[in-house]
UniProtKB/Swiss-Prot annotation:
Record field: catalytic activity: L-glutamine + H2O = L-glutamate + NH4(+)
Organism in which the protein naturally occurs: Cytophaga hutchinsonii (strain ATCC 33406 / DSM 1761 / CIP 103989 / NBRC 15051 / NCIMB 9469 / D465)
InterPro entries: Beta-lactam/transpept-like (IPR012338), Glutaminase (IPR015868)
Protein's recorded name: Glutaminase
One matching Pfam family: Glutaminase
Binding sites annotated in the UniProt record for substrate: 63, 113, 157, 164, 188, 240, 258
Keywords assigned: Hydrolase
Organismal lineage: Bacteria, Pseudomonadati, Bacteroidota, Cytophagia, Cytophagales
Segments forming a coiled coil: none
EC code(s) of this entry: 3.5.1.2
UniProt record similarity statement: Belongs to the glutaminase family.
């Protein structure tokens, strides 16, 4: 299958959708990004690559980083972690406090903000320098030592992240955050600020398409069981509160971020990464979602 030709077709078809939606202006450092930007990248497990548009341009990956820290966490402790965070779709906004109160400080899943705080707290407990550990892991799986945090974005989130702090302290009151809340949230804001390109992302998550093994280095990142489980959580919980519609339209394990990125896994075959900053009301890239829908329609690459 000629993936470059397919992506070229998508680049033409997607033009009417570019610029639609709203950038994540509640994070001041992201407010000025051009919503018409668009990039897409494919990496297959046997080394085939294809890109279009702004696939080489770095952007703030935001909640896509939650896959990285979840991978680190399950490799450290894949049993006790699930006593602190659930595995169910939330059906609520990713930063909702209401559900957290009703469920005694146990977040529904690791991909909503509260759940990601718990995961970051677990990672924090295992490393002397958790920010450096997360960065080193990201560079390793992406095979790009130039990847770094965007410190302007991290500072912007720290200055405006009052709801995240509220969630952290609320869970702390239930005993579900072990370390100092502000220290954990500082790490969380930095992981969300990671600056990566579509090319970086489509390479970094190949281990999830290859039973936990990174084909670029043949290094085992996590067990097949945990790789399967992360894929399952991405399918059911990875696209905020429009996960059902996304599964209907695309049908791939995926994770989005409010920076406009989406990563999708085709198990046993490839990783697709797309970026366009204009967001839907639920916080997912509008053009990115459409591009993935077109890709699945053209290729039949869905898990169903």
């Amino acid at each position: 299958m000629n993936y470059q030709a397919i992506l070229n077709q998508i680049q033409g078809d997607i033009q009417p959708y570019l610029g639609q939606g709203k950038v994540a202006d509640y994070i001041p450092a992201l407010a000025g990004i051009n919503p018409s930007k668009f990039g897409m990248s494919i990496h297959t497990i046997d080394g085939i690559t294809a890109t279009i548009g702004d696939a080489q341009e770095q952007f703030s990956i935001q909640s896509i980083s939650k896959i990285l820290t979840l991978t680190m966490a399950v490799s450290l402790d894949d049993t006790n972690i699930w006593k602190r965070v659930g595995r169910e779709p939330s059906g609520s906004k990713f930063n909702s406090l209401i559900q957290l109160e009703l469920e005694q400080g146990i977040p529904r899943n690791p991909f909503i903000n509260a759940g990601a705080h718990v995961i970051t707290d677990l990672v924090y407990s295992h490393f002397d320098d958790p920010k450096e550990a997360i960065l080193a892991f990201t560079r390793m799986v992406s095979m790009n030592d130039s990847i770094s945090y965007d410190y302007v974005v991290a500072q912007s989130e720290r200055e405006t992240g009052n709801r995240n702090l509220a969630m952290g302290y609320f869970m702390k009151s239930f005993g579900n955050i072990e370390n100092k809340v502000r220290d954990v949230l500082d790490v969380y804001f930095h992981q969300c600020s990671l600056a990566m390109s579509c090319t970086d992302l489509s390479k970094a998550f190949l281990y999830l398409a290859n039973e936990g093994v990174l084909p670029t280095s043949e290094k085992t990142i996590i067990t097949k069981k945990n790789s399967d489980r992360i894929n399952a959580l991405m399918l059911t919980c990875g696209m905020y509160d429009s996960v059902g519609d996304f599964a209907y339209r695309v049908g791939l394990p995926s994770k989005s971020g409010v920076g406009g990125g989406i990563v999708s896994i085709v198990p046993g075959e490839m990783v697709i990464a797309v970026w366009s900053p204009g967001l839907s009301e639920s916080g997912n890239s509008l053009a990115g979602t459409k591009a993935l829908e077109l890709f699945v329609n053209y290729t039949g690459k869905t898990i169903f």
